[in-house]
């Protein structure tokens, strides 16, 4: 009680009562402390006794083996973690079965219902009893097989795991089975389909080849897992993403995903042998992404591969020795620096398996971080092929992870290659253009445009009347520069009346520098025009040295004059006289072996002598088949585009593939190949049985030309088709048997000796590219349906239009060759060649092809297939240049 001594004394008058109070307080405190200590000691003793008893009880428990049912359920929980895991296992089984069509139907994110159907090899009846048992597979027999495993599955756990956490049904049929069989499974064993039935054996039923697996009530016997996966929307999104990934990696397989009861699929790819990964990516993720994809390939056997879409890979900076040591190949589709999204899309397949690689994903994200804005992400699809001996697939229960030999070095190579390509693409920018023509969205010109024209004409008349009556009338509104149209489709330029420079090497300078003219695509073996190219091969090096077009007429406006083209020195020395008629006549002569010639190959020279006609009136056709074909394209005319082609003004050519034209205040880009093909198709039908003729001064052997065409990769000839000489002989006889029809209706003249005498003149003053003559004859013999009248005429006209159309591919290559010559030879002569070629070509397009567009009946498809694309308007240009 020492602490009481420190307290101040109580101020009280009764000392006895104070002493009694102090004694009472002291006694109470002492009793309370004693009671608390006693209770604490009792609690501690009880806890110690309980823990000791628990330890004694635990030590008495024996180690025992888990039942097989418990083991299977635990294993199933590891393999099948959510519906998307189950679908992944089933998809890989379908692909292992060589399926070409896979259809998936889901309900509630796959928790309530998940069904997958394929057209693969199916399951044999004798295997259906054990198909859902654990560790049963047809893909692995011993552990060493893992080193060379090629299939997706190998453990035999997928169906077993699914059957332990759901109600599983299988309907399957093999190709040699007379019917399909249906069976139900639970916990890896066959089970009766309903409580009323006792037999669990597979039941025969109707079905198609392949397998249909239905999973119902997933995780019905594991409530904890089912409660975790309550978000069915998230589970469905995972399934959609999974289907997209497998669809991209297997473009030849058709993948279909839809919700139960919904007829419209959410994922649908067509598949087929011609389907490519880029096409699938475009259909699933949109064309905005597919246009910006870079195809990157790494192959130790081909360090400089050529990719599709001109995405060529420069492998000079890759160390081939290290690449060979790593022993892997890669093909990837990477978005360029012009594309980014808020969410990253990283898809990785290694030896066909969908796997994750955090290291590779992080490494590539670091590469893209230098080029993309902060907070945006790229699209990456990577397919790695590694020798099975260098990869361990037995790492993760869900097979989502693998281990690769030299993984760090492989990732480093991929990072380096992607960085190289992105640094190149970062220097360019892609701008989208509008394909649909504004104002031409409907078949007819908009009424507002017509009203505007009518109002303009009426206002003009009113103004003129008012001005005559009242000179002091109000002033006309000011016309701003940006609204003024300075071009007129009815006006003509001086160059239309001048003979243009010949673009076919028929001038002295081109003879000196470009090996002369002639059909450079084929070698003249025996020196005769009739056997031009006989037994020879396609000569791509001489592809540009051709007389591919008709020289433009010098006096095109004089209907009575015959026009002779410009000739080279050698041509003037060996000029031959040719009689011209009212038809267009092409004379073919061979060039002599002059010492001045720089090669020993004789080339076929073409000279065109033209007697222009006045406005043609087409001959009335009485054949029903031709009338039907004409009415088909006339009834499908886009009126807006019809006005467009009537009033557009030629601006210039772009790479000879496209031309720039102005219509009103807008600038358009038109596809010359598509439009000229349609033009010559329609002109061929309108000129049916009334063609002029282009004749050769020396007949050409059809057999020899067919042999040349069969040597071309364009022919598609394979060894299984038979010997080329026999094919050429058969096709020659076929064309000879049809010579009366071809001559009477299409002016394709063939004599009894199997020689080509002439071809039709579809458009006045225009001669097609003779490079295509062998292929034209081949297609004419093989692609035409000769048995039926309408199909026969349509097929012939189609091949004629393909023969006469503007071919941009050859012209691009020709300009490339000329540009290369300019780089090595900076003389004025070489520069003039390039000018001559482009100037002559543009003259042909501007003054022969473009006027014919007024006769065109443009189909409606031209409005949205890229044939006509709006580039800009005067208003937009005025904002930039402040003048027009």
UniProtKB/Swiss-Prot annotation:
Gene3D superfamilies: 3.30.230.10, Histidine kinase-like ATPase, C-terminal domain. InterPro entries: DNA_mismatch_repair_CS, DNA_mismatch_S5_2-like, HATPase_C_sf, Mlh1_C, MutL/Mlh/PMS, MutL/Mlh/Pms-like, Ribosomal_Su5_D2-typ_SF, Ribsml_uS5_D2-typ_fold_subgr. This is DNA mismatch repair protein Mlh1. GO terms for biological process: mismatch repair. The gene is mlh1. Residues 446-472, 577-590 have a biased composition (Low complexity). Keywords: Cell cycle, DNA damage, DNA repair, Nucleus. Pfam families: DNA_mis_repair (PF01119), HATPase_c_3 (PF13589), Mlh1_C (PF16413). One of its GO terms (cellular component) is MutLalpha complex. It comes from Dictyostelium discoideum. Heterodimerizes with pms1 to form MutL alpha, a component of the post-replicative DNA mismatch repair system (MMR). DNA repair is initiated by MutS alpha (msh2-msh6) or MutS beta (msh2-msh3) binding to a dsDNA mismatch, then MutL alpha is recruited to the heteroduplex. Assembly of the MutL-MutS-heteroduplex ternary complex in presence of rfc and pcna is sufficient to activate endonuclease activity of pms1. It introduces single-strand breaks near the mismatch and thus generates new entry points for the exonuclease exo1 to degrade the strand containing the mismatch. NCBIfam families: mutl (TIGR00585). Belongs to the DNA mismatch repair MutL/HexB family. Residues 473-489 have a biased composition (Basic and acidic residues). Heterodimer of mlh1 and pms1 (MutL alpha), and mlh1 and mlh3 (MutL gamma). Forms a ternary complex with MutS alpha (msh2-msh6) or MutS beta (msh2-msh3). Interacts with exo1. SMART domains: DNA_mis_repair (SM01340). One of its GO terms (molecular function) is ATP-dependent DNA damage sensor activity. Residues 1-21, 297-318, 442-522, 544-605 are annotated as: Disordered. It is found in: Nucleus. Transmembrane segments: none annotated.
